[in-house]
Amino acid sequence: MTLFEAIILGIVQGLTEFLPISSTAHLRIVPALAGWQDPGAAFSAIVQIGTLAAVLIYFYKDIHSITRGVFDGLRSGRPFETQESRMGWMIAAGTMPIVILGLLFKTEIETSLRSLYWISVALIVLALMLTLAEWLMKRRADKGLKAKTMNDIGWKEALLIGLAQSIALIPGSSRSGVTITGGLFLNLSRETAARFSFLLSLPAVFAAGIYQLYETRDQLMASGSDLLNLAVATLFAGIVGYASIAFLINYLKQHSTALFILYRIALGVGILGLIANGYLQA
């Protein structure tokens, strides 16, 4: 990988990690279209540490209050007394499914499931699921049912959205896409679904990044250029990722996810067309 490729892929990661369009899909598609080598699942996981930093900075106040609530609850012997402490434990519980399934299906995630064919299918299927979630949300609104806010999230919502997050192990599905979709099915407002999605991502993204750093430590230490390129890609991913978070949170206050649904379908169908005509290898 060249430095130029690292910069481009870092920007791609930052742009697509938080939008419900799948960063893994784009990190697979862009190199394929450009004639570059697939950076691999390990690259994706490590560069996500940059976008993790973006979440930490953007949601600093939320994270600080949640962390303080958890420790205060432990010290007082009442770990679930406050909304902040409960949120911390709910995020931890919601993270368990993706951790367990990620370890069980690590080989498939890094090999066969990275096929452009399966990525295209995942892009389209999740778009249809998101369409259904939007339709249900509109029906509830027409009936006068108010959407839930962060204060309304309970154990049921946290665990079900956590289960939905495990679907993101399939490249092309999108971690933010499946968690936002899960949130909409559970009647969270779009903004709330996105906000909880980003907070829920912290433990899983951190764990995946650290694990892949450990797994590839010998390769990285043996090649200074690989280490530099990875650092540059991670930096660009963090900077662009911060802007993507701000954009999506503000966008969903006033708009539906229709734009992302149309994009996912167009991209998925387009890739299948390129594969069918021999322009891309699955």
From Swiss-Prot:
Per UniProt, the keywords (alphabetical) are:
Antibiotic resistance, Cell inner membrane, Cell membrane, Cell shape, Cell wall biogenesis/degradation, Hydrolase, Membrane, Peptidoglycan synthesis, Transmembrane, Transmembrane helix
Q: Which domain of life is it from?
A: Bacteria
**Gene Ontology biological process terms from the UniProt entry:** cell wall organization; peptidoglycan biosynthetic process; regulation of cell shape; response to antibiotic
Membrane topology type, per the record? Answer: Multi-pass membrane protein
Molecular function GO labels = undecaprenyl-diphosphatase activity
The UniProt entry, under Pfam families, shows:
BacA (PF02673)
Q: Which InterPro entries match?
A: UppP
Residue ranges crossing the lipid bilayer per the database entry: 40-60, 87-107, 116-136, 153-173, 196-216, 229-249, 256-276
EC numbers on record: 3.6.1.27
Keyword Lipid biosynthesis assigned: no
Q: Where in the cell is it found?
A: Cell inner membrane
Keyword Cell wall biogenesis/degradation part of the UniProt annotation: yes
Q: What else is known?
A: Bacitracin is thought to be involved in the inhibition of peptidoglycan synthesis by sequestering undecaprenyl diphosphate, thereby reducing the pool of lipid carrier available.
Q: What family does this belong to?
A: Belongs to the UppP family.
Q: What's the protein name?
A: Undecaprenyl-diphosphatase
